[in-house]
């Protein structure tokens, strides 16, 4: 819950940035991305979000020193290896908001999987990311393996195990840690996107995040852009009620990256 609060506060900080203006071509970590003229977008790396999050980590003694060190190193590459973008638009029903997270997959993989640096499969995967191209045979095998894991029906995924904390209760007898789940609905199969500068794969899904009795309907739209040497995963998230407004914006923005 602490991390969610930090993210929410960081989002508020992003929303208060003034003087951003409207833009059609927006620079992201993998290149320029096109958004409609009536959509305002701001990058978290260009705000004081980094300082805010680092301050929160310093004030949270429950985090281990190693965790804080890893997080600090992570934020040193804020705006280069990863970034968060806030999108704001509006229609006749009111203001619309969404977030896009961008992550350099190659850099993250190299940091997380250091122990696999000499593994032939890992080396081959890194070579493909450097080249920015996947051959048709490998593509079909990859998509087949990935899409087998994507639910074809509404599926509830548990995010924690409440039984582990069954003894932690409030004075009134309520569970201190509530069950958290993520329901996946109408999940789209991962597929190649035509008409892009770089090989791109995309998918989307409706989601329902539940924390006890509190439910949050969401919509996620993701694209993996294989820019040579800098493959980036983009994940756009908004509320489900704003899905129709942002779906086309996400689709076109990810497709336009160059």
For each of these PLM feature ranges, what is it?
Residues 35, 39-43, 47-50:
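N-terminal secretory signal peptides
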Residues 46-212:
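Conserved polar/disulfide-associated segments of primarily extracytoplasmic proteins
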Residues 83-89, 216-228:
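Short, surface-exposed beta-strand/loop micro-motifs that present aromatic residues
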Residues 8-16:
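Bacterial N-terminal signal peptides
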Residues 1-8:
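Bacterial N-terminal signal peptides that target proteins for export
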Residues 198-200, 215-217, 226-234:
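Coil-to-beta-strand transition motifs
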Residues 30-33, 39-40, 228-258:
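Surface-exposed amphipathic alpha-helical segments
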Residues 18-25:
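Sec/Tat signal peptide C-region and signal peptidase I cleavage site
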């Amino acid at each position: 819950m602490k991390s969610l609060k930090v993210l929410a506060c960081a989002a508020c900080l992003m929303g208060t940035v003034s003087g951003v203006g409207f833009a059609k071509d927006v620079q992201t970590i993998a290149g320029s991305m096109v958004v409609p003229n009536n959509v305002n977008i701001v990058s978290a790396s260009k705000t004081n979000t980094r300082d805010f999050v680092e301050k929160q980590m310093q004030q949270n003694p429950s985090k281990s020193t190693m965790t804080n060190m890893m997080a600090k190193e992570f934020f040193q590459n804020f705006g280069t290896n990863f970034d968060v973008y806030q999108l704001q638009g509006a229609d006749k029903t009111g203001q619309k908001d969404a977030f896009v997270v961008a992550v350099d997959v190659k850099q993250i993989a190299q940091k997380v999987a250091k122990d696999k640096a000499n593994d032939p499969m890992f080396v081959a995967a890194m070579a493909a990311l450097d080249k920015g191209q996947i051959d048709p045979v490998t593509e079909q095998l990859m998509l087949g393996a990935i899409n087998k894991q994507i639910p074809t029906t509404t599926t509830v995924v548990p995010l924690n195990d409440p039984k582990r904390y069954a003894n932690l209760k409030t004075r009134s007898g309520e569970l201190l840690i509530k069950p958290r789940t993520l329901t996946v609905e109408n999940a789209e199969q991962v597929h190649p996107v035509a008409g892009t500068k770089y090989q791109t794969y995309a998918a989307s899904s409706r989601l329902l995040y539940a924390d006890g009795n509190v439910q949050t309907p969401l919509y996620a739209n993701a694209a993996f852009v294989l820019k040579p040497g800098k493959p980036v995963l983009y994940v756009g998230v908004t509320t489900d009620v704003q899905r129709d407004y942002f779906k086309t914006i996400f689709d076109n923005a990810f497709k336009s990256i160059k």
